[in-house]
Amino acid sequence: MRVLGIDPGSRITGYGIVEQAGSRLIHVDNGAIFTDSALDFPGRLKSIFDGLTTVIAEYEPDEVAVENVFLSNNAQSALKLGQARGAAIVAAVHAGLPVAEYTALQVKQAVVGRGKAAKEQVQKMLTALLSLPEVAQADASDALAVAVCHLHSHHLVRTSASAVPHRATSWRNFKP
């Protein structure tokens, strides 16, 4: 399975593509979409949508994972971040892809094993997990972490679902 991880931002939106082959995680690509500060805000949202649409067309991911909004003391910043997330999610949905969302705590827990891990610890672990030649740009690194989190979570859901005994879906199928 190939996953596009997205770390949305109104100025910089990071993306990372990770593929799972058996138990191996393979780094496909990563990068960032830098919006032009001269554009008005709707123009920046269009840049995010267009950039991610291009990435989706080029790499053909199976699923998309997006980092969830953090709480901010600045309401205006939180609103803009939410709108950038919306542009990213719409790009994925427009391509017919399923979208999962994860908090920063969930991402750190999945990658490092500790929800309170420092950004540097996450980057170091990603470099090792994905055999990266160097640490990725900060936003791209966050996006790679979101993709890895989704692959780990998806694997856990499939594994636990297969371990759950089948339940009767109606009384006719009930067998004591």
UniProtKB/Swiss-Prot annotation:
Record key words, sorted: Cytoplasm, DNA damage, DNA recombination, DNA repair, DNA-binding, Endonuclease, Hydrolase, Magnesium, Metal-binding, Nuclease
UniProt-listed PROSITE patterns: RUVC
Molecular function in Gene Ontology: crossover junction DNA endonuclease activity; DNA binding; magnesium ion binding
GO cellular component, one term: cytoplasm
Protein residues bound to Mg(2+) 1: D7, D139
Entry EC number(s): 3.1.21.10
Enzyme class, first EC level, given as a word: hydrolase
Catalytic reactions on record: Endonucleolytic cleavage at a junction such as a reciprocal single-stranded crossover between two homologous DNA duplexes (Holliday junction)
Active-site residues, Swiss-Prot/TrEMBL: D7, E67, D139
Biological-process GO terms, alphabetical: DNA recombination; DNA repair
Similarity comment: Belongs to the RuvC family.
General function of this protein: The RuvA-RuvB-RuvC complex processes Holliday junction (HJ) DNA during genetic recombination and DNA repair. Endonuclease that resolves HJ intermediates. Cleaves cruciform DNA by making single-stranded nicks across the HJ at symmetrical positions within the homologous arms, yielding a 5'-phosphate and a 3'-hydroxyl group; requires a central core of homology in the junction. The consensus cleavage sequence is 5'-(A/T)TT(C/G)-3'. Cleavage occurs on the 3'-side of the TT dinucleotide at the point of strand exchange.
Quaternary structure and interacting proteins, as annotated: Homodimer which binds Holliday junction (HJ) DNA. The HJ becomes 2-fold symmetrical on binding to RuvC with unstacked arms; it has a different conformation from HJ DNA in complex with RuvA. In the full resolvosome a probable DNA-RuvA(4)-RuvB(12)-RuvC(2) complex forms which resolves the HJ.
Name this polypeptide is given: Crossover junction endodeoxyribonuclease RuvC
Organism in which the protein naturally occurs: Pelobacter propionicus (strain DSM 2379 / NBRC 103807 / OttBd1)
Gene name as annotated: ruvC
